[in-house]
A protein has these predicted regions:
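Active-site-adjacent beta->alpha loops and helix N-cap segments on the catalytic face
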Residues: 45-57, 102-126
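Generic beta-structure capping elements
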Residues: 17, 99-101
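Extreme N-terminal starter segment of soluble prokaryotic enzymes
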Residues: 1-2, 6-12
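A generic structural signal for short
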Residues: 13-14, 70-71, 113
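Short, solvent-exposed beta-strand edge segments and adjacent coil->beta transition regions
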Residues: 9-11, 64-68, 109
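General structural feature for long, well-ordered alpha-helical segments within catalytic domains
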Residues: 13, 78, 82, 117-120, ...
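Well-ordered alpha/beta subsegment
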Residues: 72, 96-99
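Glycine-rich, positively charged N-terminal anion/phosphate-binding segment
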Residues: 1-2, 17-92
Length: 126
C-alpha cells in the first residue's frame, strides 16, 4: 500500500487513539510489525498556541515503521500552520482527523463534524 510516496509494508497498523497511541505504544507496535503508526489526536489550535503537550503528541520516532502525526481542527489557516509545524518533526505523513465523534472534538466542529461541511473539509485538506 502507498500513501502519497510512502510505501507501507505489513498488514497491520496502529490506529490513532487518544490516550492509547502514545510514543511507548507506537514503539511497541512498530517493534512487533505494525506497518505504520499514527500519533494521538492533536489539536491544531493547541499546537499554534504553543501548548507543549500538544507539540509532544506530534513527535515521531524513527524505527522500521512509518510514523504519522494526526491533527484535528476546523480552521483551515490554523490547520495549515499546525501541519507546517508538524512537518518540522519529520513525520512520514500527516493525518487530518475527520472521524472522531467525541464531544470534545466534534462538538467544536472538528473530527466527524467536518463531514457535515464538505466544502470546509476540502479547504482544510488543500
Amino acid at each position: 500500500m502507498k500513501i502519497k510516496d510512502v510505501e507501507i509494508k505489513g498488514f497491520a497498523a496502529l490506529a490513532p487513539m487518544a490516550g492509547v497511541a502514545d510514543r511507548a505504544m507506537r514503539e511497541i507496535c512498530a517493534k512487533y510489525g505494525a506497518g505504520f503508526t499514527v500519533g494521538e489526536l492533536t489539536s491544531a489550535r493547541g499546537v499554534m498556541q504553543g501548548d507543549k503537550k500538544s507539540a509532544r503528541l506530534l513527535e515521531c520516532f524513527k524505527s522500521d515503521a512509518i510514523c504519522a502525526s494526526q491533527l484535528f481542527g476546523r480552521d483551515p489557516e490554523i490547520m495549515t500552520q499546525a501541519a507546517l509545524r508538524a512537518e518540522t518533526l519529520n513525520p512520514d505523513f500527516i493525518d487530518i482527523n475527520m472521524g472522531c465523534p467525541a464531544p470534545k472534538v466534534a462538538g467544536h466542529g472538528g473530527g466527524s463534524a467536518l463531514m457535515k461541511e464538505p466544502e470546509l473539509a476540502t479547504k482544510i485538506v488543500q
